């Protein structure tokens, strides 16, 4: 099932940012990773939005599981968390090919939600019987 947010899940990125000067950039959260990270070199005056799909940074975010680290690909929760928020995976030496800095917290949260949902669904089924 596609993710409703780019913060988690393996769905392709579906948004770009248009700055006030007309520049087409990747999402603003990438500004936290390194200087110039969201820059594409595109603008609304000379480029179509579809051209952003050819930008290496955006193209990499269309790959789903293939763009994740081996550790993430082997994780049982990868379909849910998708490696976490893209910006949270950045490291100077390895780029974005890392688990989220919040990996442990994401795992705890996802397992907690799954347990609560499982209990709620089970309780609802018992009441229906």
Regions found by a protein language model. Name each.
Residues 26-27, 83:
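Short glycine-/small-residue motifs
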Residues 1, 29-74:
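C-terminal accessory region of radical SAM enzymes
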Residues 19:
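Acidic surface patches and DE-rich sequence motifs
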Residues 32-35, 44, 66-129:
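Radical SAM enzyme core and accessory elements
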Residues 1-7:
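Long, K/E/R/D-enriched contiguous segments that form extended
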Residues 22-24:
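Hydrophobic "anchor" residues
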């Amino acid at each position: 099932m596609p993710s409703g947010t780019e913060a988690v899940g393996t769905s392709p990125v579906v948004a770009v940012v248009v700055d006030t000067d007309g520049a087409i950039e990747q999402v603003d959260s990438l500004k936290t990773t390194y200087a110039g990270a969201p820059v594409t070199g595109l603008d609304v005056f000379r480029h179509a939005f579809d051209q952003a799909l050819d930008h290496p940074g955006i193209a990499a975010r269309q790959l789903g599981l293939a763009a994740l680290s081996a550790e993430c690909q082997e994780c049982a929760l990868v379909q849910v968390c998708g490696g976490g928020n893209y910006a949270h995976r950045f490291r100077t030496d390895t780029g974005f090919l890392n688990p989220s800095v919040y990996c442990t917290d994401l795992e705890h949260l996802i397992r907690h939600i799954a347990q609560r949902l499982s209990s709620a669904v089970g309780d609802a089924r018992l009441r229906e019987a």
